[in-house]
Amino acid sequence: MSGSMCAETVRIDGHDGDEVEAYLARPAGDDSRGGVVVIHHMPGYDRATKEITRRFAELGYDAICPNLYWRDAPGAAPDDAAATARANGGVPDERLIGDVAGAAAHLRGLAGSNGKVGVIGYCSGGRQSVLAACNIDLDAAVDCYGAFVVGTPPDGFPLQVKNLVDQLPRLGAPLLGLFGNEDSYPSPEQVTELDEILAAHDKPHEFHRYDDAGHAFFAVDRPSYRVAAANDGWERITAFYATELGG
């Protein structure tokens, strides 16, 4: 495809019918296509996340990123909104599920939608991607180094989160997981634990682990960026969504 696309800020119906700001990117043309909900990382609804959203449009998908911190600090700069959300303990799981469900419904209501929607999240969004796929009708999920899908947050961790072990039997979509072997949250041992739990419940999943990569290896604007891991990860994501979403 040509890669031509358009992007805009929209409003969607989120949890409990709340109006939520979101960033929508769409490829040009009327071809039938799947959709991708992008869950932003802990630093928030920032330029890097919007670039990722546009990248999915360039790949041929309708893509949307809801601003999960919209209620905490409407109109605030990403860093300020993220700080406010952290001070509030992070995004409650129930609210996250409702906002992602609203984003998925928005994508399915667009002209040209083939009805298939995937979700992807980075950092805290990786855990939230798995959470969403355990509670919402989705067709594919990608977890990029999401912490505390298994395991327990350390003392002093700013977000009020618990692991998803009790929810994993409800995982309703194939899962692609991308992890760095130098990460601590999730650690390689935690990735292995997650792999074993999913296998025990016969959940379709595909994990890839990268040496010389830790947390946030996709983040091009951070010292944690690792070119080889990120490039391979994007190839895995592209192939996975092509299979599961019909792209």
Task: Name what the model sees in each region.
Residues 1-247:
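N-terminal cap/leader regions of alpha/beta-hydrolase-fold enzymes
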